[in-house]
């Protein structure tokens, strides 16, 4: 049995186990991770590389930064201020998604989510609304916001690089031609019909970020300093390129500053790290690596694209590429999905004599639609435990958003980027 076939079998196993959740999600991820080593698909170093992935390091750091906001009561104070202005659940969803979406357009969507997750949990605690109904719109908005500018997500730059090789390019905000209507439609959906699809889970008793605490005895300087360090961490992420320090390291500096200044104790810092999230994300990265390294992902793409024939309609090609990227990105990283699909799409479009921009943008936008699984993007995984989400929760709330993104994209792309411009 080939390595690619074994990988696809592990993918099938993971999907089934994630859907029915007979065993915890993190345990399923570790079974896949270890299974890929035992079967010889991956070596130990590659299989476990996910646990030192930059996103995992960022998770750990931001769990501590978020933990400090809760331990000091600052998250609740911020929540009280926000709920004073946004009094209904609907207005909170609109406000959160709008702020996160716009921030994510110029910042890392993972970084944006990591900074704002503890704030939103504080808002939920103060307002009395279920955090599960606020966190999922937050991470979805972070993904949609990545399609507002050239630097919003790594996949955007991959397509830009491919276009550059044939003397074409996207403008800095050209992605927003499609991305902004999708963000607006997504916000409108979750503020209306989609509200009923958002999960409504109570906070678990063992939750590290419980808002039911007495903060009267916490020194005010700790509250102020926790907020100052959060703001400085956010500023560091905004100016990541200028200062030359990676997001995950900026997060680590913030976490260390909180511990060294005594804002949060080492014990509370360790308690705030959600190991279930770490095991889920780190373990499933091995599956993403296997899909990439064995060529299993490429096989799927080639089979689907090949089924279209030698001269497919550019409209059909764009739709199929979009949907294929949507499916793949929910199990592989969106960067890997885009990197895999962009050369294939560019080659086919050029062979047809069509302008490749619509197809490439379909590839990038589709590759960002990781809304249907908890492993589709790092931000999804970060809120699994805090929101008490299951695999089915993501599918129920996320699949309609994929449908909305598909319809919006298929209407706008051929108009904004004609296949055969005059």
What are these regions (language model features)?
Residues 1-60, 64, 177-302, 318, ...:
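Hydrophobic transmembrane alpha-helices of multi-pass small-molecule transporters
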Residues 14-23, 99-109, 140-151, 236-242, ...:
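Transmembrane alpha-helix interface/packing and boundary motifs in multi-pass membrane proteins
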Residues 44, 90, 131, 172, ...:
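Alpha-helix N-cap/start motif
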Residues 6, 91, 126-140, 145-158, ...:
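Juxtamembrane and boundary regions of transmembrane helices in multi-pass small-molecule transporters
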């Amino acid at each position: 049995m080939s390595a690619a076939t074994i990988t696809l079998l592990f993918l099938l196993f993971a999907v089934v186990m994630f859907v029915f959740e007979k065993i915890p999600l993190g345990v399923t991820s570790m079974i896949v991770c270890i299974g890929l080593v035992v079967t010889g698909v991956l070596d130990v170093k590659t299989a476990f590389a996910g646990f030192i992935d930059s996103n995992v390091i960022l998770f750990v750091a931001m769990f501590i930064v978020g933990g400090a906001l809760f331990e000091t009561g600052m998250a609740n104070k911020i929540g009280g201020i926000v709920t004073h202005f946004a009094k209904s659940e609907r207005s909170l969803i609109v406000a959160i998604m709008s702020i996160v979406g716009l921030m994510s357009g110029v910042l890392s969507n993972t970084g944006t989510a990591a900074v704002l997750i503890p704030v939103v949990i504080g808002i939920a605690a103060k307002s009395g609304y279920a955090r599960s109904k606020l966190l999922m719109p937050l991470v979805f908005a972070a993904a949609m916001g990545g399609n507002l500018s050239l630097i919003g997500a790594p996949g955007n730059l991959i397509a830009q690089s491919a276009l550059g090789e044939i003397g074409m390019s996207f403008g800095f905000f050209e992605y927003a031609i499609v991305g902004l209507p999708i963000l607006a439609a997504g916000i409108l959906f979750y503020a209306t019909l989609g509200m009923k699809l958002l999960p409504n889970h109570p906070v678990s008793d063992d939750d590290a970020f419980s808002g039911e605490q007495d903060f009267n005895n916490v020194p005010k300087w700790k509250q102020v300093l926790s907020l100052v360090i959060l703001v400085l961490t956010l500023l560091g992420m905004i100016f990541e390129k200028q200062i030359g320090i990676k997001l995950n390291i900026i997060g680590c500096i913030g976490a260390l500053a909180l511990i060294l200044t005594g804002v949060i104790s080492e014990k509370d810092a360790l308690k705030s790290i959600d190991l279930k999230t770490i095991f889920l994300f780190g373990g499933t990265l091995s599956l993403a690596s296997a899909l990439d390294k064995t060529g299993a992902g490429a096989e799927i793409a080639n089979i689907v694209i090949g089924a279209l024939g030698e001269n497919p309609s550019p409209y059909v090609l764009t739709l199929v590429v979009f949907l294929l990227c949507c499916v793949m990105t929910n199990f592989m990283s969106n960067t890997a999905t885009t990197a895999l699909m962009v050369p294939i799409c560019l080659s086919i479009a050029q062979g047809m004599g069509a302008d490749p921009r619509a197809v490439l943008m379909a590839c990038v936008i589709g590759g960002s639609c990781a809304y249907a699984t908890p492993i589709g993007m790092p931000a999804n995984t970060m809120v699994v435990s805090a929101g008490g989400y299951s695999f089915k929760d993501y599918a129920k709330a996320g699949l309609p958003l994929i449908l909305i993104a598909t319809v919006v994209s298929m209407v706008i792309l051929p108009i904004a980027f004609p296949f055969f411009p005059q």
